[in-house]
Regions:
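Catalytic alpha/beta core domains of metabolic enzymes, predominantly
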Residues: 128-131, 140-190
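Active-site beta->alpha loop and helix N-cap motifs at the rims of alpha/beta catalytic domains
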Residues: 2-12, 16-143, 153, 161
């Protein structure tokens, strides 16, 4: 895991602006510049705040590629690539890697409520791409929670897993993860 980045600091979950039913790339570009000018330490397009479940595949791909291009290496870009479909999450993760993203934010597969083993297998498959993974544990949105044991297992067994965005709002869960492994813990519930 020494070759993988450690994502730290305040990062912004970007909104995906629309105008007349289309992604407003001018507004997105202005937002990216403003966030970088104000000192953000990372950009996260196509996460929950970026309305990833409501974007078409084409829109999703274009927003990620645009964000990477606009950031131009000034700050890391962690592209939201999660899906309740492992194959779709793989496609999104591969695209993010090809576009030049520095990492990917992988929300727990929503609606289907897989077992902890199923969650682990989902993450392990995505890890095969090789793009650094930030797990996203937000059970209030997904209906399923990664347990601390599963987080530790993913971190220890899947070299691409470098961080978790822990959004359960449960200090005991965060403490259990922190005391069990050296994964970077990011916090946020948006």
């Amino acid at each position: 895991m020494t070759d993988m980045p450690r994502f730290v600091g305040s990062m912004v979950a970007l909104v995906t602006p629309f105008r007349d039913g289309e992604v407003d790339f001018d507004a997105l570009g202005r937002n990216i510049e403003e966030q970088i000018d104000q000192g953000t330490m990372g950009l996260v397009p196509c996460g929950t705040t970026g309305e990833s479940p409501t974007l078409s595949h084409d829109e999703h791909d274009k927003v990620v590629a645009f964000t990477v291009e606009k950031a131009a290496g000034r700050v890391p870009v962690i592209a939201g690539t999660g899906s309740n479909s492992t194959e779709e999450a793989l496609r999104l993760t591969r695209h993010a890697q090809q576009a030049g993203a520095d990492g990917c934010l992988v929300v727990n597969p929503y609606y289907n409520k897989p077992t902890q083993q199923g969650l682990y297998e989902h993450v392990a498959r995505l890890g095969e791409v090789g793009l650094p993974i930030v797990l996203y544990n937000i059970p209030g949105r997904t209906g399923i929670e990664l347990t601390p044991d599963t987080v530790v297992r993913c971190y220890e067994d899947v070299p691409a897993v470098v961080a978790i965005k822990e959004a359960t709002g449960k200090p005991d869960v965060t403490s259990a993860i922190a005391s069990s492994c050296d994964i970077t813990i990011l916090s946020g519930d948006d």
